[in-house]
Amino acid sequence: MSEFKVKTGLAQMLKGGVIMDVVTPEQAIIAERAGACAVMALERIPADMRKSGQVCRMSDPRMIKEIMEAVSIPVMAKVRIGHFVEAQILEELQVDYIDESEVLTPADWTHHIEKHNFKVPFVCGAKDLGEALRRINEGAAMIRTKGEAGTGDVSEAVKHITKIKAEIQQYKENLKTESDFAAKATELRVPVDLLKTTLSEGKLPVVNFAAGGVATPADAALLMQLGCEGVFVGSGIFKSSDPEKLACAIVEATTHYDNPAKLLQVSSDLGDLMGGISIQSINEAGGKNGARLSEIGW
């Protein structure tokens, strides 16, 4: 079995689960108790990164290690786009997965990390099929929608998953000849065989999770019904008044996403949820609510 197949197999093990952002071992324990399939260890959740206006880098490895020691579920950590040395450090730390994340300040505005150079599986964000396939070609073992992290507004995540699905369907219908496939692969900057495999299967060849703006059980179920295979929850849980109850509810909603009776049950009496900010209030050039993080990446 190829090393890439091993890495994609590890990512497949998370399918149907919820991955939660945590900033302390105590939060990681809450996430594990609530049924999270993995946690993302970071020093600040995306909502706080967005407000800070500062350069956001890889978290302190000591903090990540403390979280790794606190739980038995897999632990992920983020690196800046293109910062392969941060990735080398996290691989040496033996994190379970690395997220090359647009939420952090990019280290390289031209290149993403060549992920085939690492044994640890990588997660990457994408807002359309071209981005997803470019990241997979670089070695990403899991794709997630970019959404708009730190907002509590799920609309961008919805837009990204529906766009990827629509592009796959459109290309399946419209690409007929070898020259059609070659032209589209050139346009997307990906190998023809990768494009053909994706269209033949009718979906990405790696697991595709939802991320960015998920704040309620209904948000999680919506994205699962739209075709996502699991959910990342960032700022939403620990910006709420009852994090453990909300975390349990989102896990239940992700599992029972097509059961309205169960969704009604888990959506009730959750306390105050994350207030959030709407996508429309974010100035793409920056401002009090920060930049459009989903536009970062190429």
From Swiss-Prot:
Enzyme class name: lyase
Active site feature: K78 (schiff-base intermediate with d-ribose 5-phosphate)
CDD domains, per database record: pdxS (cd04727)
Annotated TM spans: none
Catalysed reaction, written as an equation: aldehydo-D-ribose 5-phosphate + D-glyceraldehyde 3-phosphate + L-glutamine = pyridoxal 5'-phosphate + L-glutamate + phosphate + 3 H2O + H(+)
An annotated Gene Ontology molecular function: pyridoxal 5'-phosphate synthase (glutamine hydrolysing) activity
Chain sites annotated for binding D-ribose 5-phosphate: D21, G150, G213, G234, S235
Keyword annotations: Lyase, Pyridoxal phosphate, Schiff base
Stated induction or repression of this protein's expression: By the absence of external thiamine.
EC number of the protein: 4.3.3.6
GO biological process per UniProt: amino acid metabolic process; pyridoxal phosphate biosynthetic process; pyridoxine biosynthetic process; thiamine biosynthetic process
Associated pathway: Cofactor biosynthesis; pyridoxal 5'-phosphate biosynthesis
Signal peptide annotation: none
Entry keyword Lyase: yes
HAMAP family: PdxS (MF_01824)
Biological role: Catalyzes the formation of pyridoxal 5'-phosphate from ribose 5-phosphate (RBP), glyceraldehyde 3-phosphate (G3P) and ammonia. The ammonia is provided by a SNO isoform. Can also use ribulose 5-phosphate and dihydroxyacetone phosphate as substrates, resulting from enzyme-catalyzed isomerization of RBP and G3P, respectively.
Similarity comment: Belongs to the PdxS/SNZ family.
Complex formation: Homohexamer. Interacts with THI11.
Protein name: Probable pyridoxal 5'-phosphate synthase subunit SNZ3
Protein source organism: Saccharomyces cerevisiae (strain ATCC 204508 / S288c)
Gene from which this protein is expressed: SNZ3
